[in-house]
Each structure stands twice: as structure tokens, then as C-alpha cells.
């Protein structure tokens, strides 16, 4: 996860710097986080909120923090699912149970869709930026998938196998 304040610090007009965080797949997902720093002016936020609306998105203004809102809240969802797999619960069972509980897809199908490399990098970044809390420690299973090149749909294999 990028720190918008770090980018803004190098900009000649940091008050005109903010972020827009779209969700994958961006053509389908309606949510966009509009990320403000401590120096972002209100006009910049208004422009980005309107841009989000013009793009057919639902903009939510949030503070510049590790993972912003969605990625920070999603970390425990992924990490606890990975911990269950480490404890021997079958991945298809975890996905099926969470899909039956109302999630659009289970966590492993979602990680494969997003890309295991991206998801693992975000997990590591949020973990480090928040001071390495044990509850957010990235999973060894996910680290292995990335090391093996099993990045999900984009590589043809991840937690599941896909036809390219």
C-alpha cells in the first residue's frame, strides 16, 4: 500500500495531492477510496470525489493510513483464512463456507483473482507499517505461493488451477 503523504512530500503543491484507490476488477467494482493526507485541501478532495462519481463509482473519503480502509479491514479476513488452511482445513471448504455465508466469493478465489503477489505484498506492507502486530503476520502459505510463481488467475495457478 502506497503512502500518499510520501508522494505528496515530493510534489511542489502537496496540498493538491490525494490518492484514488480502485478495486479489482475496476470495471466491475463500484467502490473507490479517495485518500487525503493531512495537508490535502478540500477542493482537491471535492474534485476527486466528483471524478469518482463521474466514473460511476461510489467514492469514500479516507485518511492516508496503511492499507487505507478496505485493505486494512480485509487483512484479518485473508490472514485468518490462511491460518485455517495452515491448520489443515481444506481450502475449498473455507471458500464454500464463506460463500455460503454471503461473501461473493471465498478468500482463496478472491486472492487468486487479485493476484497472490499483490495480496501478499499488501499484507507485508500493512504488517510492517503498523509495527508488526502478530494478528497481521503474513502467511507462510502465501509466501510459498508467490515464491513458486503461483500468482493466481494471471499465472494459471494459485490456490486453484485455471485455464489460461
Name these PLM-found stretches:
Residues 1-164:
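N-terminal glycine-rich phosphate-binding loop for ADP-containing cofactors
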Amino acid at each position: 500500500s502506497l503512502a500518499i503523504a510520501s508522494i505528496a512530500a515530493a510534489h511542489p503543491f502537496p496540498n493538491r495531492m490525494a490518492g484514488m484507490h480502485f478495486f479489482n476488477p475496476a470495471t466491475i467494482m463500484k467502490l473507490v477510496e479517495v485518500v487525503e493526507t493531512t495537508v490535502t485541501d478540500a477542493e482537491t478532495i471535492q474534485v476527486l470525489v466528483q471524478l469518482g462519481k463521474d466514473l460511476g463509482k461510489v467514492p469514500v473519503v479516507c485518511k492516508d493510513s496503511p492499507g487505507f480502509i478496505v485493505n486494512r479491514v480485509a487483512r484479518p479476513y485473508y490472514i485468518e483464512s490462511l491460518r485455517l488452511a495452515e491448520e489443515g482445513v481444506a481450502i475449498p471448504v473455507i471458500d464454500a463456507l464463506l460463500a455460503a455465508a454471503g461473501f461473493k466469493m471465498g478468500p482463496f478465489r478472491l486472492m487468486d483473482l487479485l493476484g497472490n503477489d499483490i495480496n501478499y505484498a499488501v499484507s507485508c506492507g500493512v504488517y510492517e507499517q503498523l509495527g508488526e502486530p502478530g494478528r497481521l503476520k503474513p502467511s507462510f502459505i502465501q509466501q510459498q505461493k508467490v515464491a513458486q510463481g503461483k500468482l493466481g488467475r494471471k499465472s494459471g495457478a494459485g490456490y486453484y488451477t485455471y485455464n489460461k
